[in-house]
Amino acid sequence: MIKIGTLTCLHSNNVCARVGCLKAFQNRSDFFEGYSLDTFLGAMMTCNGCKSTNPKEPDEDEGILEKIDRLVSEEIKVMHVGACRLDGKKKECPRITRICEMLEDRGIQVVRGTHRE
């Protein structure tokens, strides 16, 4: 059994119920293809928000650091990052990019995608 999780944009909580991500995982479709049925979705986290609402960069944000520590302690091996990481020009949010780097630095594989992009 492998434990995986999702990382999504805090701001997207205003309009997203995570239905697409969860449905893709449940059906093992899109970016979740290839996972066995015993794969465990063990974490769902958000970023620390936009700079305009939270001036702390992810490296300095106690909440993000605590979340990543918890992912490691729970033995989450892969984090899938939602399409909400992309702006209208399909450019990835720099805060999400940094969080992905932080995850990889701690040995957690990052997959950019959940359901369709």
Each PLM stretch: what is its role?
Residues 73-116:
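Short, compact, well-ordered microdomains
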Residues 1-68, 92, 109:
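Conserved mixed alpha/beta catalytic, RNA-binding, or beta-rich assembly cores of soluble enzyme
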